UniProtKB/Swiss-Prot annotation:
Homotetramer. The gene is alaS. Keywords: Acetylation, Aminoacyl-tRNA synthetase, ATP-binding, Cytoplasm, Ligase, Metal-binding, Nucleotide-binding, Protein biosynthesis, RNA-binding, tRNA-binding, Zinc. Belongs to the class-II aminoacyl-tRNA synthetase family. The modification N6-acetyllysine is found at K74. GO terms for biological process: alanyl-tRNA aminoacylation; negative regulation of DNA-templated transcription. This is Alanine--tRNA ligase. Disulfide bonds: none annotated. It is found in: Cytoplasm. One of its GO terms (cellular component) is cytosol.
């Protein structure tokens, strides 16, 4: 019996664990601190800084099963998903990595053993082919002489992409930086399937399928294109879980593996589909994976960047459900089946199931309201089409007006053998496409980045003053030996009390000083394992090797500690008051305020905000001890410690506990006891995205300041109302009631004045071909009274055309009224449009009533004078 996908995943990790590799959990689909990458799209993403020499780990071998998304840029698989055997928006990348440890020999031997050993995957050796880079004789000889693959199944691939080192078998991180040749392993499905081996004219067929890519990072590419050998060559490999599952389960399409068969059956059940070969089932089965995991990792549907890509995928899935005949919301119902089929890889998703389902349901309901209208408009346009291409402007209008992603437009057109003018669409969508575009590499010159080989020891948990030594200096990203007064720089010390920004807590400020210099620290950041003090040398000079005294701004750090500890208390309180679906989606902790983003689907009620405040303040009054313990990551999770969204953790973690109330993983700085916080107050609660709320709060002196400010405002209002705080509510109600009464009386007076003005105006109407025409500019009349006046005048004048205007604060307000017996000849909307155009405005409305505005008051007299001629022409 063949292995399940879950068993294949586990076997891969177990094999490399047996070879001394650290099993590392999948990182978030949202890359950590990497703005150049839209989504995690390869297993090596979380180790990028290790490969670049910017970070160090306590292991030199690692293995992962990494969740990946490719949609939205160079790796945009969206339009092909469901129509080919191997395109996905979401996939899992199995990988093993060596950071300056083993190299080509072991990497190749490990791969061969896992694939062919009877204990592991037991693939027939004669079915495996390999490629190597044309000049990589070392890899070729390992495959031929050590592994024993016949020469005819080892293929050299040269620079087949039109430039030096531009090859399917040469991997580059970017224009500069680590790169090297790679060897790829292919599986031959047999001659009953069309296709040729790699490098042949028939290589795009489905017979020979790449299952594993092994990259040998051995060069550092310079800006001038030269290749310098890396001092410690590394290995980065990737094998698509879905691809190897298809091979091991003896099927030719990824969509026929056990995981997808189960999901496709679930899709058929919720949509009512009966034909299990329908490609729309594949589309939806793929899309639920990317959508659910993206939401679980904090991405919310929106019209920008990652949220826009998520929205496109959701809407494409909903549209395919619509094609299958789904009559009600269905997509969210697939989260449960997905969790079941993902096994241990779905544990994070299971914890957030309710939140993910709610976001999907809300988005689907929102799109359902526009889908029908958008499809109808597209049908109209296609019916009028004379050629075989839909113009880009129409495709953009569908997006802009109906939120209809171009992918959906292309899908509909594809079914009718019609192309979409993508160039025209791109021109209209350039800005949105720029925001959503995924960088093809890592988009930076890594030779210019700050690289710190040494590590800094952080001692700020116990010290705010410390003596250290300068180990590195950087100016404009470049290492220097010394800096002088007035220069801005980054200073790295061997040990420091300064906390570097992470976990939502801002970096420390303070001073580095010595006998002859003073360096003002304005921020502190991490650079791999080093801590950089960012600021300006106020006096003297500073050079590498100098001894310094590092002094943290103690008062500022104290305020930050209170805010950070209060954040933990508030997180726990939110889960008690609102439910355990609450999870952190982001945070900011500085010396003035704490800001906390969390998953919740509706605005908090005033009583819920009060309950959270009361609960936090109750823990403050309990004066609970705040304790930290260092333990293994898995032990911390077993203890119930909550992890912070988007953070990376080592295998040994710091667990922060506040009595029996809160336990979280946290590397930040905190108060000693909850009582130190003093007071906690929420100052705002708002929404930041669908399903995400934001609270801002203050503590300690900041909270007391808000109490004083509220009290001062209350006293001022009481003084103005000639009352005291005890009966203030009654006073305000009385004033509001009196105000409402006066406004009502004022409105009645205005209406009486307008009626009188209308009576006076009616005598100014002139006859134009049997129709009364009245055109007038009014002074002292509110724009909102114009409509009432037109109605009165129409009643008085019978067959009539009326144009009234007024100017308030430099803005022109216009209205046109036409009696219904005249609308077949003169339409109010056309008339008002003609006038508005002359005063720099626009407007519209019904044939019998239309309004407009304008900005050019000086042009109003001439515009009104033109009405008579225009009307006369229409009435002839």
């Amino acid at each position: 019996m063949s292995k399940s996908t879950a068993e294949i995943r586990q076997a891969f990790l177990d094999f490399f664990h047996s070879k001394g590799h650290q099993v590392v959990a999948s990182s978030s689909l949202v890359p950590h601190n990497d703005p150049t990458l839209l989504f995690t799209n390869a297993g090596m993403n979380q180790f990028k800084d290790v490969f670049l020499g910017l970070d160090k780990r306590n292991y030199s071998r690692a293995t992962t099963s990494q969740r990946c998304v490719r949609a939205g840029g160079k790796h945009n698989d969206l339009e092909n998903v469901g129509y080919t055997a191997r395109h996905h928006t979401f996939f899992e990348m199995l990988g093993n990595f060596s950071f300056g440890d083993y190299f080509k020999h072991d990497a190749i031997q490990f791969a061969w053993e896992l694939l062919t050993s009877e204990k592991w995957f037991a693939l027939p050796k004669e079915r495996l082919w390999v490629t190597v880079y044309e000049s990589d004789d070392e890899a070729y000889e390992i495959w031929e002489k050590e592994v024993g693959i016949p020469r005819e199944r080892i293929i050299r691939i040269g620079d087949n992409k039109g430039a030096p080192y531009a090859s399917d078998n040469f991997w580059q991180m970017g224009d500069t930086g680590p790169c090297g040749p790679c060897t790829e392993i292919f599986y031959d499905h047999g001659d009953h399937i069309w296709g040729g081996p790699p490098g042949s004219p028939e290589e795009d067929g489905d017979r020979y399928i790449e299952i594993w890519n092994i990259v040998f990072m051995q060069f550092n590419r310079q800006a001038d294109g030269t290749m310098e050998p890396l001092p410690k060559p590394s290995v980065d490999t990737g094998m698509g879980l879905e691809r190897i599952a298809a091979v091991l389960q003896h099927v030719n399409s990824n969509y026929d593996i056990d995981l997808f068969r189960t999901l496709i059956q679930a899709v058929a059940k919720v949509t009512g589909a009966t034909d299990l070969s329908n490609k729309s089932l594949r589309v939806i089965a793929d899309h639920i994976r990317s959508c659910a995991f993206l939401i679980a990792d904090g991405v919310m549907p929106s019209n920008e960047s990652r949220g826009y890509v998520l929205r496109r995928i959701i809407r494409r899935a909903v549209r395919h459900g619509n094609m299958l005949g789904a009559k009600e919301t269905f997509f969210y119902k697939l989260v449960g089946p997905l969790i079941d089929v993902m096994g241990s890889a779905g544990e994070d998703l299971k914890r957030q199931q309710a939140q993910v389902e709610q976001v999907l349901k809300t988005e689907e309901e929102q799109f359902a309201r526009t889908l029908e209208r958008g499809l109808a408009l597209l049908d109209e346009e296609l019916a009028k089409l004379s050629g075989d291409t839909l113009d880009g402007e129409t495709a953009f209008r569908l997006y802009d007006t109906y939120g209809f992603p171009v992918d959906l437009t292309a899908d509909v057109c594809r079914e009718r053998n019609i192309k979409v003018d993508e160039a025209g669409f791109d021109a209209a969508m350039e800005e949105q496409r720029r925001r959503a575009r995924e960088a093809s590499g890592f988009g930076a010159d890594y030779n210019a980045m700050i690289r710190v080989d040494s590590a800094s020891e952080f001692k700020g948990y116990d010290h705010l003053e410390l003596n250290g030594k300068v180990t590195a200096l950087f100016v404009d990203g470049k290492a220097v030996d010394a800096i002088n007064a007035g220069q801005e720089a980054v200073v790295v010390l061997d040990q420091t009390p300064f906390y570097a920004e992470s976990g939502g807590q801002v970096g420390d400020k303070g001073e580095l000083k010595g006998a002859n210099f003073s360096f003002a620290v304005e921020d502190t950041q991490k650079y791999g394992q080093a801590i950089g003090h960012i600021g300006k040398l106020a006096a003297g000079s500073l050079k590498v090797g100098d001894a310094v005294q590092a002094d943290v701004d103690e008062a500022r750090r104290a305020r930050i500690r209170l805010n950070h500890s209060a954040t933990h208390l508030m997180h726990a309180a939110l889960r008690q008051v609102l439910g355990t679906h609450v999870s952190q989606k982001g945070s900011l902790v500085n010396d003035k305020v704490l800001r906390f983003d969390f998953s919740h689907n509706e605005a908090m009620k005033p009583e819920e905000i009060r309950a959270v405040e009361d609960l936090v303040n109750a823990q403050i009054r309990r004066n609970l001890p705040i304790e930290t313990n260092i333990m293994d990551l898995e032990a911390a999770k077993a203890k119930g410690a909550m992890a912070l969204f988007g953070e990376k953790y080592d295998e040994r973690v710091r667990v922060l506990s506040m009595g029996d109330f809160s336990t979280e993983l946290c590397g930040g700085t905190h108060a000693s006891r909850t009582g130190d916080i003093g007071l906690f107050r929420i100052i705002s609660e708002s929404g930041t995205a669908a399903g995400v709320r934001r609270i801002e709060a203050v503590t300690g002196e900041g909270a007391i300041a808000t109490v004083h400010a509220d009290s001062d405002r209350l006293s001022e209002v009481a003084h103005l109302l000639k009352g005291d705080s005890n009966n203030l509510a009654d006073k305000v109600r009385s004033v509001l009631e009196r105000t409402r009464q006066l406004e009502k009386e004022l409105q009645q007076l205005k209406e009486q004045a307008a009626a009188q003005e209308s009576a006076n105006l009616s005598s100014k109407a002139i006859d134009v071909n049997g129709v009364k025409l009245l055109v007038s500019e009014l002074s002292g009349v509110e724009p909102k009274m114009l409509r009432t006046m037109v109605d009165d005048l129409k009643n008085q004048l019978g067959s009539t055309i009326i144009v009234l205007a007024t100017v308030a604060e430099g803005k022109v307000s216009l209205i046109a009224g036409v009696s219904k017996d005249v609308t077949d000849r003169v339409k109010a909307g056309e008339l008002i449009g003609m006038v508005a155009q002359q005063v720099g405005g626009k407007g519209g409305g019904r044939p019998d009533m239309a309004q407009a505005g304008g900005t050019d008051a000086a042009a109003l007299p001439a515009a009104l004078a033109s009405v008579k001629g225009w009307v006369s022409a229409k009435l002839q």
